[in-house]
Amino acid sequence: MSNYKSGFIAIVGRPNAGKSTLLNALLKEKIAIMSDKPNTTRNNISGILTNEDCQYVFVDTPGIHKPQQQLGRVLNKNAYSAMEDCDVIGWIVDGSQAFGTGDSFILKRIETLHKPVVLIMNKIDKLGKEQLLKRLMYWQKQYDFNDIVPISALVKDNLEELLKVFKGYLPEGEPMFPEEMKSDHDINFRMCEIVREKILFKTHEEIPHSVAVILERKEKRGNRMYLQMMVVVDRESQKGILIGKQASMIRSIRLDAQKELKDMLGCSVDLELFVRVEKNWRNHENKIKEFGLDELEQIDED
């Protein structure tokens, strides 16, 4: 393949900047779960876009933030690792917001890497033309970016231009992944993420940061798939919230997840959810690893 390009693009930014929304929009497929809760993404999720002259490998990193717990430090470590290994950094920001403390935290890290940095100014659908020009000028003063590309991941505005800019920073080389491959994460990981997404949408603020979802059993029964998952929280009170009055909350989560899992797997799904308390698990490195947030654990495919 003469002049073919392929490489890694780290998508970084503050929590809630729109990283996962952008990844899904670029791939035209749901690879990363989405929520309005900060730090929805925990693992570095690679989304792969292949066309006739370029293969883009996007790494959707956890939102970089000042950590309060061991889990937060692990999330930052995951993001930093992606930045160090990539060919170009795509720093996504909410174009309607000013440069803040969280951005300073990211900038300090970027400055040590000496990598090309493309500023992705997201959520421009919220801005008028004059506002957009002012925000572009404002961000140009914050850092010597290699490029600045205004987009709206939500309405898929200017994404082709963003791909064109990224391509300019990728090295020539053969595709690293098969053309049909959209993610380097297996189906087990993605199934657990769907359940976690439903929990994020339905529970109170204290639950999202405290929850991990583990696939414990997967079994094909005729034309149906049986799945058993364990939902882990770190306090008894959170277990009560997750289960709900007369098990109403866990039932609602199960039914919503079951519907999406059916669409993903192409067959009927029987999903069982159990809730377990692991006190203060977010501060124990061995538990973080056990739950697949530092290194993904996998269940063998049947």
Regions found by a protein language model. Give the residues of each.
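Conserved, well-folded catalytic cores of nucleic-acid-processing
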Residues: 29, 48-52, 67, 82, ...
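Canonical P-loop GTPase G-domain recognition
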Residues: 116, 125-183
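Active-site glycine-centered loops adjacent to acidic/histidine catalytic or metal-binding residues
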Residues: 60, 122, 152
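Conserved G1/Walker A P-loop phosphate-binding module
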Residues: 1-77, 81-83
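Catalytic P-loop NTPase motifs of RecA-like helicase/translocase cores
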Residues: 41, 64-66, 99, 127-128, ...
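Conserved C-terminal guanine-recognition region of P-loop GTPase G domains, centered on the G4
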Residues: 50-55, 77-148, 219-224
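Conserved glycine(s) of the Walker
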Residues: 18, 158, 249
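P-loop NTP-binding site
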Residues: 187-302
